[in-house]
A protein has these predicted regions:
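Conserved P-loop NTPase nucleotide-binding/switch module
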Residues: 1-63
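Residue-level detector of flexible, active-site-proximal loop/helix-junction positions
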Residues: 34, 74, 91
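Short proline/glycine-enriched turn/loop segments at secondary-structure junctions
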Residues: 56-57, 74-76
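H-loop (His-switch) and adjacent beta-strand-loop-beta switch element
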Residues: 70-72
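NTP-binding/hydrolysis catalytic cores, primarily Walker-type P-loop NTPases
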Residues: 77-145
C-alpha cells in the first residue's frame, strides 16, 4: 500500500503503524497528547513494556515526518473551531545520534527559520515552487495568531 490510515492510535496498533513507516508506507493517524514533542514517547508507550524504548524512540525519529497538534477554541457564537497549535518536523542526526524536533509552528506562530533544508526541499519539489509558504492567506492567518 501507499498509505496506511488508522483513525486513532490507542494501543498495539501503533506497532503496525511504525512497521508500515519503516517500509516506506506513508502513515497518518490521530492520538491524544498535549504537545507534538511528546508524540514519539506516546507511541512508544502504547507499544507496551516488552520493547527497547530508546531504540523504538530513535527509530521513530527516523521514520516520522510531521507532528501536528490542534487546539479547540469556541468563538463568541458558541461555534467550536479547531486550529493548528503546533507543527514539528522529526529528524535524527545520524552523526551525533541526536533526536531533533524542529518546531515550525508553536502556539499558533509560524517560525519559518525552523524549517530544515531537507523538509524545505521536499516541499519545494512537491509544490513545484521555491516559496513553500505560497498560500498567503494561510501565512497571514498563522502570523496573526
Amino acid at each position: 500500500p501507499t498509505w496506511l490510515m488508522i483513525t486513532e492510535a490507542r494501543s498495539k496498533e501503533v506497532e503496525y503503524l511504525k512497521e508500515g513507516m519503516t517500509t516506506g508506507v506513508h502513515c497518518i493517524t490521530t492520538l491524544h497528547t498535549d504537545d507534538v514533542r511528546k508524540i514519539p514517547i506516546r507511541i512508544v508507550g502504547m507499544m507496551g513494556n516488552n520493547v527497547d524504548k530508546k531504540q523504538e524512540t530513535d527509530e521513530l525519529y527516523m521514520v516520522l515526518d510531521l507532528g501536528i497538534h490542534l487546539t479547540i477554541k469556541e468563538d463568541s457564537d458558541g461555534f467550536i473551531h479547531r486550529e493548528i497549535d503546533q507543527i514539528c518536523y522529526y529528524d535524527k542526526d545520524l552523526v551525533t545520534s541526536e533526536n531533533i524536533c524542529h518546531m515550525i509552528v508553536d502556539k499558533g506562530q509560524l517560525f519559518e527559520e525552523n524549517v530544515p533544508d531537507k523538509l524545505r526541499e521536499r516541499v519545494q519539489e512537491a509544490i513545484h515552487s521555491d516559496d513553500i509558504f505560497s498560500c498567503k492567506e494561510l501565512k497571514e492567518k498563522i502570523s496573526n495568531n
